[in-house]
């Protein structure tokens, strides 16, 4: 993934300046290699800035993913995504009760007390909440 991403960003850089480049990983992907790509390549590091890692979770199903025990001490990707995120969008809040939503938010805060949490439905989020927010910190991410 990292090599492909670095090559893709280098190609984009040749086309001219962009206001923003949004990267969406597939499902339960480890965000660490993506984030490290911004620091491992001189071309990427000089021309792109990792602004924030935003995680979108499904309010109805996130708890089963966060509490899932993986075989052979494998990493729980859901926990890793939440832990590594700067902002977490809890979507489909209309599909759970207020108590369930409080439980979801509480569990997310238990994994990541630094991230701002936005609860919404139909993925409606003001772009000012997720673009140009300068939330990423490599130091915090390594904690």
Can you name each region flagged by the protein language model?
Residues 1-78:
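Nucleotide-state-sensitive switch-loop elements of NTP-binding domains
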Residues 77-143:
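C-terminal accessory "lid"/substrate-recognition subdomains
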């Amino acid at each position: 993934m990292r090599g492909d991403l670095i090559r893709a960003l280098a190609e984009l850089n040749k086309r001219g300046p962009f206001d923003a480049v949004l990267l969406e990983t597939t499902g339960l992907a480890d965000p660490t290699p993506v984030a490290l790509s911004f620091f491992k390549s001189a071309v990427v590091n000089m021309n792109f800035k990792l602004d924030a890692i935003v995680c979108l979770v499904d309010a109805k199903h996130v708890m089963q993913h966060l509490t899932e025990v993986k075989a052979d001490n494998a990493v729980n990707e859901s926990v890793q995504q939440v832990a590594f995120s700067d902002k977490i969008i809890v979507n489909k809040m209309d599909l759970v009760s207020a108590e369930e939503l409080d439980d979801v938010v509480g569990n997310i805060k238990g994994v990541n007390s630094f991230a701002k949490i936005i609860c919404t439905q139909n993925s409606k989020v003001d772009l000012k909440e997720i673009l140009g927010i300068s939330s990423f910190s490599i130091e915090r991410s390594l904690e």
